[in-house]
Regions:
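Conserved beta/loop motifs at nucleotide-recognition and modification sites
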Residues: 1-2, 8-11
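Generic structural signal for residues in well-ordered beta-strands
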Residues: 3, 82-84, 180
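Conserved SAM/SAH cofactor-binding pocket of Class I
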Residues: 11, 17-114, 118
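Mobile active-site "lid"/loop adjacent to the S-adenosyl-L-methionine
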Residues: 108-139
Length: 196
């Protein structure tokens, strides 16, 4: 699948395929999916493309990113099963009208604030989609405790994680009463955390 991107969205990377594959392994054919921080819509739309009975909601704080995601959904013929909503998980009450989901996908910001990034990434991708505090964990700390309000009983959340973050994000999940399992990417690095 090809996705349009703009400076308002992250460029989809091959590593994120680990998230989609884990989602396909974990979710039913008719799953209701929430994609948090949808950006270009790549995770949600790739999942819906592979699961014709599924439907989903992509949220993002950026209206410009949501316009890109919506256009990608239209272009890929998935617009009837994908809804895009402006919401910021750092604001109280953001989830009230969304309902519950079988599957939550999330590639949150997870880069440490002072990280040295490739100039192409730092200059051309939105900082709000990259940086998450001094340890890169701020967004996980905000999202994971809210999963109980988002998931149906037996639901699953799948997070993309950065290098060296599996143990820390797993501990955040454990503190909130969830079990976590790591999935490795094609380079054999921990890339996804499956939270139940």
């Amino acid at each position: 699948l090809e996705f349009a991107v703009t400076p308002d969205t992250l460029i989809p990377r091959g590593d994120s395929e680990t998230i989609v594959q884990a989602a396909l392994d974990c979710a039913a054919q008719d799953a209701r999916v929430l994609d948090m921080g949808t950006g270009s819509g790549a995770l949600l739309l790739a999942f819906l493309h592979e699961r014709p009975g599924a439907r989903g909601v992509g949220i993002d704080a950026s209206a410009a990113a949501l316009a890109v995601a919506s256009a990608n959904g239209q272009r890929l013929g998935l617009a009837k099963r994908a809804q895009f909503v402006q919401a910021n998980w750092l604001e109280a009450g953001w989830e009230h009208d969304l309902g519950r989901f079988d599957l939550v996908l999330c590639n949150p910001p997870y880069v440490e604030s002072d990280a040295n990034l490739d100039p192409d990434v730092r200059e051309f991708e939105p900082a709000t989609a990259l940086f998450a505090g001094p340890e890169g964990l701020d967004d996980y700390r905000a999202i994971v405790p809210q999963l109980g309000k988002l998931l149906v009983p037996g639901g699953v959340a799948i997070f993309e994680i950065g290098a060296g973050q599996a143990e820390a994000v797993g501990a955040i999940a454990s503190e909130s009463g969830f079990a976590a399992e790591t999935r490795r990417d094609l380079a054999d690095r921990p890339r996804a955390l499956i939270v139940r």
